[in-house]
Amino acid sequence: MKAPNPKTLQPRDYQVNETWLAYRINSAPINVDHKEIDLYVLQDAASMFLFGNVFAAAGTDFPEIMQVEKLLSSAHAKRDQWPIELLLPGNPGQDNSFVIAAGKHEVKVRGVPESQLSFYIKDTQEAYEDFLGSSEGDA
């Protein structure tokens, strides 16, 4: 694994399945059934493969632990391997559900400045916004 530096992280910085990323992709709350939610994704840093997503109440710092555990288990089932580390934007606390769930599988969790994850976040946000735009046009 290459040592990360303050620059924007890129897929070329990683090997497949050594590092996963978890982050919120919506820039504004999503209104579903009169409730505002945030959408979090789990992604492989090298391949950019999206393992899946979970929802959280808008304004909370992370999804519920059960959702995160299911998401991580589903990703593990697809790769039959745990990553070495999980990157989260910012400085996640020990109460963060991603920190707790990853720790159960001895996956190291590392907080990084959100700006270093911008390559991934922007790409996923653009795809998400394109999808929403095409879905709204079909309705």
Give the ranges of each region predicted by the language model.
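Secondary-structure boundary/capping micro-motif
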Residues: 1-139
